[in-house]
Amino acid sequence: KALTERVQFDSTMSAIDAGDYLELPEGSSAAAYMSDGSTMEEIFVVSCKDKTDASAVKIAMQELLDSQTQEAGRYQPEEAERLNNAVFATYGTCVVLCVTSDTDTANAVIKEYVG
């Protein structure tokens, strides 16, 4: 939630069910937000029970990101660029994807929570 409040987004962000977009391993918890507008901005934060599950979630997120980037490349090249520059990393058992132009703030907020 801190990401939605402190990072600059071009569109309004609304909570979504991460399970609609990713297959979540048993025992994991997730928070996700997507843009209400015509941007590809989004946030996925998935906390997994172990690093094996986190690796599987990261692969699934990469596939989602790749497919969105390919789609955006056809119709919204500026959004494809934003997707290519997304903050996307695993911190222990937590996988974070944040698509925004404000990557510096996103990285700072994430570091506060994951160390």
Over which residues does each language-model region extend?
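Soluble, non-membrane globular domain cores that form compact, hydrophobic packing
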Residues: 1-115
